[in-house]
Amino acid sequence: MTALTQMKCEACQADAPKVTDEELAELIRMIPDWGVQVRDGIMQLERVYKFKNFKLAMAFTNKLADLAEEEFHHPGILTEWGKVTVTWWSHSIKGLHKNDFIMAAKTDQLLD
């Protein structure tokens, strides 16, 4: 499979398929620092990034905002002193789409 960071998000309509259990098992191995959370019955990807201070956390948040606008796919973001919690899911399908895994991998790349 092509590296997730080399892929582009595709338009995700309300009738787009959610990832299957098999796809989930394969894709989650490609982003090992991410976990799967279920909130209100909606499966989501989540990761907490740690930073030395608020300014670094905010700089990361701003880079993530630029990436989200570029890919036209937007996460939940909670920026706090020393950490940023990022949550990816596809609102239109109320669950996980391949786009979410692509964006999780690209989010990790922002640390480089």
UniProtKB/Swiss-Prot annotation:
This protein's name: Putative pterin-4-alpha-carbinolamine dehydratase
Similarity comment: family membership:
Belongs to the pterin-4-alpha-carbinolamine dehydratase family.
Q: Name the catalysed reactions.
A: (4aS,6R)-4a-hydroxy-L-erythro-5,6,7,8-tetrahydrobiopterin = (6R)-L-erythro-6,7-dihydrobiopterin + H2O
Q: InterPro entries attached here?
A: PCD_sf (IPR036428), Pterin-4-alpha-carb_dehyd (IPR050376), Pterin_deHydtase (IPR001533)
CDD domains assigned: PCD_DCoH_subfamily_a
Which keywords fit this entry according to its UniProt record?
A: Lyase
Entry keyword Lyase: yes
In its UniProt record, a GO molecular function of this protein is: 4-alpha-hydroxytetrahydrobiopterin dehydratase activity
Which E.C. number(s) belong to this protein? Answer: 4.2.1.96
**Can the keyword Lipid metabolism be found in this entry's annotation?**
no
Which EC class is the enzyme in? Answer: lyase
Q: Which HAMAP family match?
A: Pterin_4_alpha
For this protein, the record's PANTHER family field holds: PTERIN-4-ALPHA-CARBINOLAMINE DEHYDRATASE-RELATED
Query: What organism is listed for this UniProt entry?
Result: Shewanella sp. (strain MR-4)
The Gene Ontology biological process terms listed for this entry are: tetrahydrobiopterin biosynthetic process
Q: Which NCBIfam families does the entry mention?
A: PRK00823.1-1
